[in-house]
Amino acid sequence: MTRFFADRTRLLRTAFAFVLMLFILPFGFSEKISDRDFGFSLDVPEGFEVADYTTDGMSYFFSHPNIPVTLVMKICNEPSSRAKDVLKKNLEKLSAKGDTDSFLWNQTPCGISSFTMTLDDNYFGWGVTAPLKIQDYYVLLLCYAPENQKGCEQFIISTINSLCIDAEYLNTPGIITSYAFPSEGKKSVLLTIGGKKIQTSIDKSDLEAAKFTIDLEYAVLNLYANHKLWKEAWQRYYRMIYRDNAGRIQTAAGDIYNELYPELRLKTPQDADIKYAQALLSWVQTFNYERAANSKESDFTSIPASISGKGSDCDSRSMLISILLNYAGLDSAILISREYSHAVVVTDIPAPGQTFTMENGREYLIGETTAKVTWGMIAQDHADRTKWIPVTFNE
């Protein structure tokens, strides 16, 4: 990997330990920050507050009441400029030090930098720039913390990594992860679903990159264990994993769909959706069960690792099915439960059985991934709908 901050990239791949304490927030964001005019969004960790903004609405400063991290979001009008140059120009205005690099994120030229600067204190942080859908406009993100608060780096990376500049690429790896883990070439994967052999592939970097994202987001999630926004933080944790991991198995999702669905539609067109969903459910029910040996690590097995044969638990399996069904145009989500320590998959396929009422008012069919049962069945001791939290992925 030839990157200007190879040492920083090695740090990215290392789990950091937060030494900060979170207390109850008086107010803070628990939903996405979005701009409809320019078409971008940020799914930042819970609790950020607007500290300041410009009257033209083009610059915002966000602070966090419990974590010493500042986020600057600026819309820049820079005709005939490159993303890298826009970032460099703005860092120079702050007398910030650090190299700036350019790279392609979803085929779009972007700028990235890790920097240090001195304002009222000494700070370190990350910055990115990316072009927006309106020509000659860029979004600039700077996220930083005091130099003596290195434990904040995961929080900073997670914040910037949540940027989306095009809804078409919502569920693809984030901007920093994409920079740190460039493609290394295809790796073959052989799947057996419903008795059929399906040859597919992932990228050689996907296992390491997906695990990095999981470790990163798990560190952020742990900050909210006793927080009043724990539920929202938990939902975000799974959204961030889905976004990264779904993008890594799009080839596999297509290969699975093309091998199974057309034949089902030809034989029984009226039942093709539920039969396809059942083939996927029966497949993951055969996976080996595995949880993290270390309680400090996430139990979540990455989706690329799951389809490569590594053991998994209920949440990994549920997310895998959700990715595959969403790829097929069959809306799907997962349900998670703190009380049951369990996860299930749900889908908007009309069929008999147990359902869960989603926020859109529709009844989604429940799928249990760890017991060998059909769609629409759930254990009686897991049937209290108030104990389940929905996590949706296509918003």
Each predicted region: which residue ranges?
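Bacterial N-terminal signal peptides that target proteins for export
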Residues: F4-F16
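Bacterial N-terminal signal peptides
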Residues: A15-I24
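Surface-exposed amphipathic alpha-helical segments
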Residues: F40, F48-E49, L141-Y179
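Conserved polar/disulfide-associated segments of primarily extracytoplasmic proteins
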Residues: Y53-L140, N148
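Secretory-pathway-linked proteins and extracytosolic
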Residues: I193-T251
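Secondary-structure boundary elements
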Residues: Y238-G309, T370
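Hydrophobic/aromatic-rich core segments of domains that either
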Residues: S316-E395
